[in-house]
Amino acid sequence: MRCRRAELATLAQGIGLGLGVEGPVISPTFVLARRHAGVDGRPGLVHVDAYRLGSAAELVDLDLDETMDRAVTLIEWGAGIAEDLGGSHLDIDIRRSGDPADETRVVYLEGFGPRWQDVDLSPLSEFPLGTTPDETGDNI
């Protein structure tokens, strides 16, 4: 899956929109974590910026375990400190292309744990830039 730079800025917003959470999804940079309530029994969204955290213990101090069973928890910059937070997680790794003049990003998805054991993520791997599976005729 390939994205443009502006599309990456809206990843968390798109996840929030898909979940139908209350209010705008904005960066948690200065507060570390923002919680967005779910509506009509749907899961909420917990958006964490772990860039300034020094250890997994600091992540645990955010009490994310209180909402893990009823919210999607999106952790930016969580590599190395967030893997053991829940029993299952989906890594979304966003990388720049090798060409410095090319602003596209490549998104790699890898599921871990029982939740993702039988999920085939390969249908998400190749869509034309700026499209969704439904727009290409594929329904996943």
Please state what every model-predicted region is.
Residues M1-L17:
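Glycine-rich phosphate-binding P-loop
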